[in-house]
From Swiss-Prot:
Catalytic activity: (2R)-3-phosphoglycerate + ATP = (2R)-3-phospho-glyceroyl phosphate + ADP
Protein name: Phosphoglycerate kinase
Subcellular location: Cytoplasm
Pathway: Carbohydrate degradation; glycolysis; pyruvate from D-glyceraldehyde 3-phosphate: step 2/5
Top-level taxon of origin: Bacteria
Gene Ontology biological process: gluconeogenesis; glycolytic process
Pfam family, one: PGK
UniProt-listed PANTHER family: PHOSPHOGLYCERATE KINASE, PHOSPHOGLYCERATE KINASE 1, CHLOROPLASTIC-RELATED
Family label: Belongs to the phosphoglycerate kinase family.
E.C. designation(s): 2.7.2.3
InterPro entries: Phosphoglycerate_kinase, Phosphoglycerate_kinase_CS, Phosphoglycerate_kinase_N, Phosphoglycerate_kinase_sf
Parts of the chain that traverse the membrane: none
Origin species: Xanthomonas oryzae pv. oryzae (strain PXO99A)
Gene, per the UniProt record: pgk
Length: 391
């Protein structure tokens, strides 16, 4: 990958601007999950250890450009960052036209989405960002799919543009999973709708050996195979598409295994009575809310024999205890597997947390939309810009 890495650069005495993803949930001025802040600390520490004058910026929420509001301020983040780094981290409010910072110091530059032109990747703004630094470091994989002034434009104009450790770890893990995977490569793609993950399914079916589908997506594939799905969430208009994906898989010698048993209920409620049924016994008023134990065991065996596992989405309504067992079985199979495993997507990360398997998954992507777009085979604007500068 032709990207200059921050870890390879001499940063002594250099002004370094780092774009991090510090977009954390804040409730009444209190940070409710600091995972992204914690993740950014090693990169900032490394820049300080290398003798740089460090400027860090990030977006937070969706503020109106050109206006400052307290709820969109990075002030709580600056406080927490200072505690984690053990150094002062002043917050600089008006920073576009110049920042005072000395080698060995770090400042946090206020929410970059407050700057006029940030969202539209304005060239004038991007050039101003670039003028602040000797080296620009893109370390926010979660925003790498957005072409904005702080994630794309600045890369074109900075004297040197590099990928930070977090971004490079993410790209390295994804490349290992998709470009050069240990075989067999198994992907789990689940979600409510085929339509939202159509590009993902179409791209993965060209790469994988097995593709496990779950949730509402699986219901559409079940219906496409000629089975009744009752009142379950599915997309009848996408049955031809599902059939095409199955045909494409067959042509490649890949497999899309379907459930043989499912867990159903009459109502979509946490305390609805759950029944395990064979796939061909689903009634007209049934809702399929999870895979059955027999299917979960079969999928777990496929995971156990995989060389690489890519996991995006829980296979049932895992928030409801009665319909969580399929997702739990697969999560535990991934945790105990020797395969290279990568998990990503909001609901997937919630399942990883629920079953406490983070330490047993090789790589957990915090990229969200960027992770999905990478899996879809799309070029991420920030990555493309870094590659162009690395030539």
């Amino acid at each position: 990958m032709s990207i200059v890495r921050m870890t390879d650069l001499d940063l002594s005495g250099k002004r370094v601007l780092i774009r991090q993803d510090l977009n954390v949930p804040i409730d009444n001025g209190q940070i409710t999950s600091e995972q992204r802040i914690t993740a950014s600390v090693p990169t900032i520490k490394l820049a300080l250890e290398k003798g740089a004058a460090v400027m860090v910026t990030s977006h937070l929420g969706r503020p109106k450009e050109g206006s400052w509001t307290e709820e969109d301020s990075l002030a709580p983040v600056a406080t927490r960052l200072a505690a984690l780094l053990g150094v002062d981290v002043p917050l600089v409010r008006d920073w576009v036209d110049g920042v005072k910072v000395a080698p060995g110091q770090v400042v946090l530059l206020e929410n970059c989405r407050m700057n006029v032109g940030e969202g539209k990747d304005d060239q004038t703004l991007a050039r101003k960002y670039a003028a602040l630094c000797d080296v620009f470091v893109m370390d926010a994989f979660g925003t790498a799919h957005r072409a904005q002034a702080s994630t794309h434009g600045v890369i074109r104009f900075a004297p040197v543009a590099a990928g930070g450790p977090l971004l490079m770890a993410e790209l390295d893990a994804l490349a290992k999973a998709l470009d050069n995977p240990a075989k067999p490569l198994l992907a789990i793609v689940a979600g409510s709708k085929v339509s939202t993950k159509l590009e993902l399914l179409s791209n993965l079916v060209d790469k994988v050996d097995q593709l496990i589908v779950g949730g509402g997506i699986a219901n559409t594939f079940i219906a496409a195979a000629g089975h009744h799905v009752g009142k379950s969430l599915n997309e009848p208009d996408l049955i031809p598409t599902a059939n095409q994906i199955v045909a494409d898989a067959k042509t490649r010698g890949a497999e899309i295994p379907l459930p043989t048993d499912v867990v159903v209920a009459k109502q979509f409620l946490p305390d609805a009575e759950a029944s395990v049924k064979a796939l061909d016994a689903v009634d007209a008023d049934d809702l399929i809310l999870d895979i059955g134990p027999q299917t979960a065991q079969r999928y777990a065996e496929l995971i156990a024999s995989a060389g690489t596992v890519v996991w995006n989405g829980p296979v049932g309504v895992f928030e409801f205890e009665s319909f969580s067992h399929g997702t739990e079985t697969l999560a535990r199979a991934i945790a105990s597997s020797k395969a290279f495993s990568i998990a990503g997507g909001g609901d997937t990360l919630a399942a990883v947390d629920k079953y406490d398997i983070a330490k047993d998954v090789t790589y957990i992507s915090t990229g969200g939309g960027a992770f999905l777009e990478f899996l879809e085979g799309k070029t991420l604007p920030a990555v493309a810009a870094l590659q162009a500068r690395g030539q």
